[in-house]
Structure formats: C-alpha cells, structure tokens
C-alpha cells in the first residue's frame, strides 16, 4: 500500500489483521464498495483549532531504577477528542505478555487506571468521543491503547506504516507487536510532502482533524517516526515522541543516564537521522520561543512542567 492524502476510508476490511487504509481513488488506494469525497475531489470541511490540551501519564515504568512514563496528549476539539499516542492499553494490562520480552527492561506498572480509556472516562467523556489518534510511531509503549478506541482514525506517516505493517524488515518484525493492531484500525497514512514549520522542512497540517495539529516527520528512532505539534492556544506543544528520551538532550544542565543513552542507540533505526533531528530540536529549544513547549514521551520532569504550565 502507498501513502494516502490523509483522508479516512469509511469501509471496513474483512481481515482484522490488516488495518483499514484511507484512499484517494487510485487503484491501489481506493476504498472498495463506495466512493468517498476524496475520490470526487471534494475538499473536507474546515475544522477549528483545539480547545484544550490535557497531559496524561498512560504508563508508569521503571527501567533499571530510572522512573519513566508514557506522556500522552488528549486534545479537546469542537469535533471530538484527539489523542497523540496512547501509551499502554487495557489489553496490555490484562495480558502483559502481549507487549513482548522488552517489558522486563521497561517494567511497566500496567495499571488500568493509567490507560487513556480510563482517564478519558474520568474526565466525563466516552471512549467513542475519541475521533482521531495521531501516532509518533508504532512501538508497543505508544500504541497499546489503540484497541480501546476502535472507531478512531489512526494517523501515521506512510514510512512508519510501511516499516511496521506493509513491508517490515526482519528487525522491524521483531520490534513491533502486531497483536496490538489485530482489531483492524482505520489507518490514515500521510506522505512526506509538507511545508516548513519552525526549522523542519516538511511538516504536514492535519486539516481533517483541525487547524492546530501538525505532523512533523522526525525519522531516526524508527523508519517513519514523527513529532506532533498541537496549538494549545497560549502556546504550541511539540510532542517529540522518542526523538529524544531525556531533558538532558535539550541542554547541558542535566546528564542523560547511561542506560537511556544505550537504549537510544540500541533502538535507533538510523542513528544519523536521529542525531540530525536531535540537533534541530536542540536548536529550536535554544531559541526560547515563548509560544513553544518541547516535550518527549518518557521524561517525567518535562511531563510535570507541561502539566504545571498548561
């Protein structure tokens, strides 16, 4: 399958092992059985910016004595809820073995109360209110909760979908946990085309979600890893996923623990790309833009800073 133009396909596939993919009407991309507005060249209705951004911990972990978490964004919009990553999900908590042996390294707590689904319910919403999930990448600690939102459209770079689903290498087949998407999510792939955004050359506004959600390709950690920028009103939040692990990467005041540096190297798909994107992130951090907050997926201090200043 090839990258789509980011518009969801309403037709379900019969094989649950293959995520449903958006189409634009070409032979390899079309949705079988019915036309969509994207096939007819009809532009999607414009949607407004996010209303509120919540910062959730969806997975407490303890790797070799280092406290970590899964930093997830919950974005309220006029058209429903949007998640940036999901952390661990309910099925992960019920069956920890499904995330693989690496759980013995990260040592997740697997608390159902920390899942995005349960926290959304605590906020007074239903899981069906989640319309879109934007993934930084397909690692198990980022996508474990997607099965808790089966009707949400799952946005990802086409490169990441290729590496995880369509044409994974041997290393990628060992890395990803296919059971986490066995329910057949509605996959929306986004190609490499885009426009400049704060020093990054090819950012893609996700207009089908809203005017304030931007997918920023940052390959290196995985084949198609991306950051996600969200307009929170008084500032932009740039969720860098696993483009870096620790706040020490941003400045020299804090030393990145050896375990995290080793893990970063071990898990990187392309170290040169990873270093290049980290250099861009550091440069952006040093500008001290007052309307920008940079966070990553696993640093507890950056997570707390985001919550304290939300």
From Swiss-Prot:
Organism domain of life: Bacteria
Keywords recorded for this protein, A-Z: Hydrolase, Metal-binding, Zinc
Pfam families: Lactamase_B
Residue positions binding Zn(2+) 1: 137, 139, 221, 242
Comment on bound cofactor: Binds 2 Zn(2+) ions per subunit.
Enzyme Commission no: 3.-.-.-
Cofactor(s) this protein cannot do without: Zn(2+)
InterPro entries: MBL_superfamily_lactonases (IPR051013), Metallo-B-lactamas (IPR001279), RibonucZ/Hydroxyglut_hydro (IPR036866)
Region annotation Disordered: where it falls in the sequence: 1-29
Example GO molecular function: hydrolase activity
Record's keyword annotation contains Protein biosynthesis: no
Ribosomal protein in keyword set: no
GO cellular component: plasma membrane
Binding site for Zn(2+) 2: 141-142, 242, 288
UniProt cross-references to SUPFAM superfamilies, sorted A to Z: Metallo-hydrolase/oxidoreductase (SSF56281)
Enzyme class (EC, first level): hydrolase
Similarity comment: family membership: Belongs to the metallo-beta-lactamase superfamily.
Protein name stated in the entry: Probable metallo-hydrolase Rv2300c
Annotated organism of origin: Mycobacterium tuberculosis (strain ATCC 25618 / H37Rv)
């Amino acid at each position: 399958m090839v990258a789509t133009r980011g518009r969801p396909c309403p037709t379900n596939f019969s094989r649950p092992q293959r995520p449903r993919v958006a189409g634009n009407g070409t032979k390899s991309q079309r949705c079988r059985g019915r036309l969509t507005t994207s096939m007819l060249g009809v532009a999607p209705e414009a949607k407004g910016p996010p209303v509120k951004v919540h910062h959730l911990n969806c997975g407490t972990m303890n790797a070799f004595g280092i406290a970590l978490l899964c930093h997830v964004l919950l974005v309220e919009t006029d058209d429903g809820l949007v998640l940036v990553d999901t952390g661990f999900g309910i099925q992960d908590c019920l069956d920890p073995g499904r995330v693989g042996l690496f759980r013995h390294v990260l040592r997740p707590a697997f608390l159902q109360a920390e899942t995005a689904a349960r926290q959304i319910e605590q906020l007074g919403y239903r899981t069906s209110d989640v319309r879109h999930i934007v993934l930084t990448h397909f690692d198990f600690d980022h996508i474990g909760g997607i099965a808790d939102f089966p009707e949400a459209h799952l946005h990802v770079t086409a490169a990441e979908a290729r590496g995880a689903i369509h044409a994974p290498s041997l290393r990628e087949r060992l890395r990803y946990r296919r059971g986490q998407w066995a329910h057949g999510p509605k996959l929306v792939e986004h190609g490499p085309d885009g426009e400049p955004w704060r020093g990054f050359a090819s950012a893609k506004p996700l207009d089908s979600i809203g005017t304030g959600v931007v997918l920023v390709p940052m390959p290196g950690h995985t084949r198609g890893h991306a950051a996600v920028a969200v307009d929170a009103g008084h500032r932009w939040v740039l969720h860098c996923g696993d483009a870096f692990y620790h706040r020490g990467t941003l400045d020299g005041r804090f030393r990145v623990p050896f375990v995290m540096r080793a893990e970063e190297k071990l898990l990187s798909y392309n170290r040169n790309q990873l270093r290049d994107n980290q250099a861009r992130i550091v440069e952006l951090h040093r500008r001290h833009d007052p309307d920008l907050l940079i966070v990553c997926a696993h640093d507890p201090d950056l997570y707390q800073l985001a919550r304290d200043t939300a």
